[in-house]
């Protein structure tokens, strides 16, 4: 494992908020999309050189947003790139094989000449009232969901370019969203400190997760504490994720209270029980803000010596016939985990001066890209089979049928957020992907809800959301209906007392007994100058639109090699 920071002004030295590798291209080319404060989306080509270092080549500058761009996500097939920003719109881009360039009204002529690829906007999705913070796709690429500062999440029919449903239960910014690979759930995470899991068929909340019992209260007194950080967390994003097989839901921005001690953590939920976490992954440093899973399935580890198993093995997160790898990014570090153990096997820190913002895996698992608000991006590179031996064939998973769209003619709904209707723009329509559902090897119900060796972390049942039943209508003629309004108190249950096993004070420190140290090259100083002030102690600079046109920092003729940290 090598850590290198590229000496590239990715977005004119402005903060970089998001990046994403393109998948589904059969390894022909590793395209990486990046976005940030300069309002542009840029596409790069990433290759591994003979010395193991990343070689980055500029491909295209996508200029259409009018304010900062907060998120970029390729569709599973890699054909479509979605971008969302502070201008409250989501743009869908496709690679145009023709030589016709994007209209110069949206792009500087000099910058357009540097483009080696031509990406054009095929649809514009309008529905949010404020900044778009996160985007996720369905497995077939026909639908997507977005999260926004307007306290809502929206489900979209990408083919039609229309809203399917508006999810408006959150009370504050929705900073992260993920769509279950099996198509059954959408999970959102907000700075209102609530994780909400929606059923994609009913468009209603299936689970609310917000508190868990605490043992710090006096005897006979039931107390609980919040599981997630509030809006004082120094990040704009809380990017949660399902594992590729849908067996686990991984949520950042967690916190665990044990007496007066508060530990930053990432919660792990089993698909069979999304009401409460099956465990958590402590982070001794800053709060965690993003989780991304490697798309490669690996074979299980083979024990070299039977005597080593009892001494060094740690409890597995889930008993699976394969091994999954994922990365957890905090404000200043990245930890690497797999599903065969609850301790991290790798740890990278002190690679950027400012807060990290996003991470992304390449399709072959050879790269993990890391973006930061200091304006730079880093790459963690892995040698062949360093993460494990890939499976020859990916396991087949059963994907549920597509979500049902809302009826066109519908009575007014006072609970819905009134927002501008979505409309289509320029031209080319998206083709419908032809991904067929696959037959599962093992049904999801066969997966254990609580693996051996992992302690359950109970959550108060008072936080389980109930959906109120509609009041019965009167059968009398010419008389108004009687409607019963249920208050929040009427929805709640009397909390039950559950004993929570307290964390030991040395829990965070003990996590790193098996971690892999950072390469010596990453411990040296960076060649670029250190910004004024300790930025890790301050939140990122406020977002702002570009006030003037800035020249592109890289030449189209150059292939820029990434130098290791010094």
UniProtKB/Swiss-Prot annotation:
Q: Which PANTHER family match?
A: CHROMATIN ASSEMBLY FACTOR 1 SUBUNIT B
Q: Give the record's GO biological process terms.
A: DNA repair; DNA replication; DNA replication-dependent chromatin assembly; nucleosome assembly
Q: Which PROSITE patterns does the UniProt record give?
A: WD_REPEATS_1 (PS00678), WD_REPEATS_2 (PS50082), WD_REPEATS_REGION (PS50294)
Membrane-spanning parts: none
Which InterPro entries does this one have?
CAF1_p60_C, CAF1B_HIR1_beta-prop, Gprotein_B, PTHR15271, WD40/YVTN_repeat-like_dom_sf, WD40_repeat_CS, WD40_repeat_dom_sf, WD40_rpt
Compartment(s) of residence: Nucleus
- What GO CC annotations are associated with the protein? CAF-1 complex; nucleus
Protein keywords = Cell cycle, Chaperone, Chromatin regulator, DNA damage, DNA repair, DNA replication, Nucleus, Repeat, WD repeat
Protein task: Acts as a component of the histone chaperone complex chromatin assembly factor 1 (CAF-1), which assembles histone octamers onto DNA during replication and repair. CAF-1 performs the first step of the nucleosome assembly process, bringing newly synthesized histones H3 and H4 to replicating DNA; histones H2A/H2B can bind to this chromatin precursor subsequent to DNA replication to complete the histone octamer.
Family stated for the protein in its record = Belongs to the WD repeat HIR1 family.
Q: Where is this region: Disordered?
A: 411-481, 501-566
How does this polypeptide assemble, per the annotation? Interacts with CHAF1A.
What is the species listed in this Swiss-Prot or TrEMBL entry? Gallus gallus (Chicken)
Q: State the SMART domains in the record.
A: WD40
Which superkingdom is the protein from? Eukaryota
Q: What is its main location?
A: nucleus
UniProt lists compositionally biased (Polar residues) regions at 425-437, 469-478
Name of this protein: Chromatin assembly factor 1 subunit B
Start and stop residues of the WD repeats: 11-54, 64-103, 127-166, 169-208, 228-279, 351-392
């Amino acid at each position: 494992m090598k850590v290198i920071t590229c000496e590239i002004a990715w977005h004119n030295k402005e903060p970089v908020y998001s990046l994403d590798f393109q998948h589904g291209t059969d390894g022909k080319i590793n395209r990486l999309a990046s976005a940030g404060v300069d309002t542009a989306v840029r596409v790069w080509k990433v290759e591994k050189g003979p010395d193991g270092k990343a070689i980055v080549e500029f491909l295209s500058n996508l200029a259409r947003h009018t304010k900062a761009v907060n998120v970029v996500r390729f569709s599973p097939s890699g054909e479509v790139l979605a971008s969302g920003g502070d201008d409250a719109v989501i743009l869908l881009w496709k690679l145009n094989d023709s030589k016709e360039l994007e209209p110069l009204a949206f792009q500087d002529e000099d910058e357009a000449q540097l483009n080696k690829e031509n990406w054009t906007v095929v649809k514009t999705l309008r529905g949010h009232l404020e900044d778009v913070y996160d985007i996720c796709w369905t497995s077939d690429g026909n639908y997507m969901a977005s999260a926004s500062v307007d306290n809502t999440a929206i489900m979209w029919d990408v083919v039609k370019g229309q809203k399917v449903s508006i999810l408006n239960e959150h009370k504050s910014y929705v900073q992260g969203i993920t769509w279950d690979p099996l198509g059954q759930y959408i999970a959102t995470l907000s700075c209102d400190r609530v994780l909400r899991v929606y059923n994609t068929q009913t468009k209603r909340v299936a689970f609310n997760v917000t508190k868990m019992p605490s043992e710090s209260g006096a005897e006979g007194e039931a107390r609980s504490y919040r599981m997630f950080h509030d809006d004082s967390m120094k990040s704009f994003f809380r990017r949660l994720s399902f594992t590729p097989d849908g067996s686990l839901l991984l949520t950042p921005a967690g916190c665990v209270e044990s007496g007066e001690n508060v530990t930053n953590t990432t919660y792990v939920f089993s698909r069979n029980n999304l009401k409460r976490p099956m465990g958590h992954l402590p982070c001794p440093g800053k709060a965690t803000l993003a989780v991304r899973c490697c798309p490669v399935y690996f074979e299980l580890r083979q024990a070299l010596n039977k005597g080593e198993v009892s001494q060094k093995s740690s409890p597995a997160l889930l008993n699976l016939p394969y091994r999954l790898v994922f990365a957890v990014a905090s404000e200043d570090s990245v930890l690497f985990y797999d599903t065969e153990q609850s301790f991290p096997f790798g740890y990278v820190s002190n690679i950027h001066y400012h807060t990290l913002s996003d991470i992304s895996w390449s399709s072959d698992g050879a790269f993990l890209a890391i973006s930061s608000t200091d304006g730079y991006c880093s790459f963690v590179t892995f040698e062949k089979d360093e993460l494990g031996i890939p499976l020859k064939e990916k396991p087949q998973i059963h994907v549920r049928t597509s979500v049902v769209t809302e009826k066109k003619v519908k009575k007014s709904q006072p609970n819905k957020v009134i927002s501008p209707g979505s409309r289509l723009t320029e031209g080319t329509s998206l083709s419908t992907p032809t991904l067929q559902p696959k037959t599962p090897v093992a049904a999801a119900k066969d997966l254990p809800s609580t693996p051996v060796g992992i302690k359950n972390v109970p959550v108060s049942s008072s936080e389980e959301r109930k959906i109120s039943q509609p009041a019965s209508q009167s059968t009398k003629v010419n008389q108004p209906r009687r409607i019963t309004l249920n208050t929040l108190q009427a929805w709640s249950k009397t909390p039950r007392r559950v004993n929570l096993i307290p964390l030991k004070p040395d829990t965070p420190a003990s996590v790193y007994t098996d971690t892999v140290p950072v390469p010596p090259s990453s411990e040296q100083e960076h060649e670029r100058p250190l910004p004024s002030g300790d930025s890790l102690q301050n939140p990122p600079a406020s977002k702002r639109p570009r006030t003037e046109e800035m020249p592109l920092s890289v030449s189209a003729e150059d292939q820029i090699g990434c130098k290791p940290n010094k």
